[in-house]
Amino acid sequence: MTYDPIALLSHGLIDLPWWGYVVVTLALTHVTIASVTIFLHRAQAHRALDLHPVVSHFFRFWLWLTTGMVTKEWVAIHRKHHAKVETEDDPHSPQTRGIDTVMWKGAELYRAESKNHETLEKYGRGTPDDWMERNIYTRFSWHGVGLMLAVNLALFGPIGATIWAVQMAWIPFWAAGVVNGLGHYWGYRNFASADTSTNLVPWGFVIGGEELHNNHHAYGSSAKFSSRWWEFDLGWTYIRILAFLRLATVRKVAPKLHLENAKPTPDLTTLHAVITHRYEVATSYGRELKALLAAELGKLRERAQRGEIKPVEVPSIWRLRRWLATEPAALPAPERARLSAMLAASKPLAKVYAMREELSGVWARSTESSEQLLARLQDWCRRAEGSGIEALARFSFQLKRYA
């Protein structure tokens, strides 16, 4: 077989129609997405699954070719993000660094933190440290992307450079920008985790399931990111296929909430279930009180219009429920100020918010014994049922069904 040198220069070894190059680009970038979410994120950073050595090394090699990222660096930075989430020490929180910075300069934040030796030593333990990792993937971390460019040019000609450029931008935009930025700024929340994480959309196709960021922050060690029947995690689908082929072993998934007939009073089983599902509890609290919250917000607006109280910036019911489902420290300062002003103007809202804070104290007081925490939960339920607020009584009844 002979090759025309001019043809090789114009379209490389493989000549495709325009849409063929689009398909190739999407396929290559999707393998990179799968490598990040399955290998780097779920297997390495959170130990949610074990991968067969062949699969693991394929992912390592592919990430070396397409991103230049070092496994230890990525894992350490991500673990630090979870440990220091929404604080000044969080490597990429839009709450402290600004959404524009994280969205468009996320890769720069990653590179800066990767030079922090303390971060790598403290949070990067347990990552691959074999000969290939030390002498190839880490020592020549950026040579892989150069090899990828050469391969693309040989296969596709000049258009290969465009494909390569898209490959280089894919993870910095979708992972470092969209997930780390928008995933803590915009979207919906299933769980009231102690941060501002959100689910971007219910269907995790484009970023392999990483779109379900709030679910992940609620149960960080779970190999499965979807939690509601209408949600879809493509990364989990791949993991199940690998497990079926005996190429992966799932170590942990998020626990499922079990309900039984309500008990007269909470017991230790109830307590443990409440602590395990604490983020679900906090979210359900706002959902159960939705009608009460809406009614009180309406009263605030009417009183402000009549001049009975100082005008307050009354939030939407959606925003108020989100405030109830977020720890105060995780709220931006302007929103905390709005919340304080609103609570000062409404005793019922102040009451339900204070009860919410007391309930979260049940799982926040790690130094107390189980018996002490159980006494707190039992007391909370008694006061909720005797508060005269029907929604609180209903919620207490619901808690006593936890098992």
Language-model features and meaning:
Residues 39-40, 80, 170, 182-185, ...:
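Alpha-helical architecture
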Residues 43-44, 181-191:
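A cytosolic-side transmembrane-helix exit/cap motif
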Residues 124-131, 186-212, 216-219:
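Active-site-proximal inter-transmembrane loops
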Residues 1-178, 222-403:
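Non-catalytic, topology-defining segments of multipass membrane proteins
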